Amino acid sequence: SYQSRGCKVYCFHHGNDASFSKNEFGHQLSTSHCKNFIVPTKGIAKRYSRDYSSLHLEKRVGTEYININSNYMYSMFTKNMYHSNSLKNIERIVIMGYPAHTYRYSCEGGMFFYHKSDLEYRLIKFIKSLGVNVCYKAHPDTLESTKGLYEGIVDEIVVKNFEDSWKATDLLLFTYTSSSTFGYALTTNLPIVLVDPSLELRDREDVILMQKRVNFIKAKVNKIGRVIFNKEELASSILSVNIKQNFEYVQEIYGVSV
């Protein structure tokens, strides 16, 4: 309303997202109507423009992605590198939980709580069969309902903020990337595993960079929405302790331009 009356209106980036999960539908609902959209870094502005500026609504509105050249996330990355990480064996894994609500998202495969809960349960059982402790980082939006799902199945349900709890684990396991937690996790020096049924939806050049930092596990969504993952690849990623300390992607999206 203010924008249509000629007022200069600024909208703000959610945080830690660099469009690794392209979300054209959600983006058009929440962002494309904004003329001035503030993002923290040049790398993020570049990717938002790449993925969304060709949308009809953005062409009509003239959406501009404005980089404020923030060094906040890069300073976190620099600080997190001081964390001692000389792993020989993976003893404790944290699975990043999906919110147990009724929303469906189209930006990645299997983005519905029923399918995610089914996947998370199978991952927990399989990883525990390898002799590794499994903790579950509950999504804060649906904390109480999640507790009832996983109590007695995992070794611990983590309720503290990720930023305050990541140092207490050996490996981080994600089943989706459209989360501010994933963006922060990239700035740590912990090994990261991603069970990813959405490879074909991602930008090829970003995937090449991300594969230098993250261990991708092949997965697909079958006809009934179940995510099928490669157990051998997952076991190898856990037991071989492949940390992947290449941070080109982090430097690309969070680095400050001079």
Enumerate the language-model features and the residues they cover:
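Structural alpha-helical scaffold elements that stabilize or flank donor/cofactor-binding regions
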Residues: L29-S30, S86, S165-K167
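Catalytic binding pocket for nucleotide-activated donors in carbohydrate/polymer assembly enzymes
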Residues: K59-N67, K147-V154, Y176-S257
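Short, charged/polar "capping" segments at the starts of alpha-helices
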Residues: S19-F20, I44-R50, S75-F77, Y103, ...
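Conserved catalytic-core segment of nucleotide-activated headgroup transferases in glycan assembly
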Residues: I66-G148
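Short, acidic/turn-prone active-site loops that include or flank metal/cofactor-
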Residues: H14-D17, K42-G43, S70-M73, N161-D164, ...
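Structural motif
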Residues: N36, R92, D170-L173
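Active-site and donor-binding regions of nucleotide-sugar-utilizing enzymes
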Residues: S1-N67
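Donor nucleotide-activated moiety binding/catalytic core segment of transferases
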Residues: Y121, V132-T188, S198
